[in-house]
Amino acid sequence: MSRIGKLPIEIPKGVKISYTDSNLQVVGPKGTLSRTIMSGVTIEMTENHISVSRDDDGIKSRSAHGLTRTLINNMVTGVTKGFETALEINGVGYRAELKGDVLNLSLGYSHPINFSLPKGINVEVDKMTKILVKGVDKELVGQTAAKIRDFRGPEPYKGKGVKYADETILRKAGKTGKK
């Protein structure tokens, strides 16, 4: 039995969950999420708990058991609290600006980068060097933050580029020069 998969998921007040034909829909105060549940996994719902169990001990069922429980837990957390990821921009002339649902980035290239935000993602820009990506879907928040970081990842010599707020960059020593 999966250690993570056997834990029940508590349903907070204000969250409604419907499960029909392997489709799970979670509705909460911050929004709605839906996901198709993998085969080999069964979901049992009570008034305030959801439990996930597997149909057999096959490899696919065992691997999907804990994953399914975690995905459902992330859906419940997303519609109640939401998820956010913070990014920082370091470098001379590097800045971010939000215009509508387009994030304009100046990252040292000869052209500005215009990044259209996906549906369901909100971005806040503070002091043109801090970006906060918010949303209900944990996977989409993380993917959007990773795409923004990929435009110019931090380089190891001066640390210029876009990095996660809690990320530490391993710095390299520069050339030592001939004496």
Curated annotation (Swiss-Prot):
This is Large ribosomal subunit protein uL6. Part of the 50S ribosomal subunit. InterPro entries: Ribosomal_uL6-like (IPR000702), Ribosomal_uL6-like_a/b-dom_sf (IPR036789), Ribosomal_uL6_a/b-dom (IPR020040), Ribosomal_uL6_bac-type (IPR019906), Ribosomal_uL6_CS (IPR002358). One of its GO terms (biological process) is cytoplasmic translation. One of its GO terms (cellular component) is cytosolic large ribosomal subunit. Keywords: Ribonucleoprotein, Ribosomal protein, RNA-binding, rRNA-binding. Pfam families: Ribosomal_L6. It comes from Geotalea daltonii (strain DSM 22248 / JCM 15807 / FRC-32). The gene is rplF. One of its GO terms (molecular function) is structural constituent of ribosome. This protein binds to the 23S rRNA, and is important in its secondary structure. It is located near the subunit interface in the base of the L7/L12 stalk, and near the tRNA binding site of the peptidyltransferase center. Belongs to the universal ribosomal protein uL6 family.
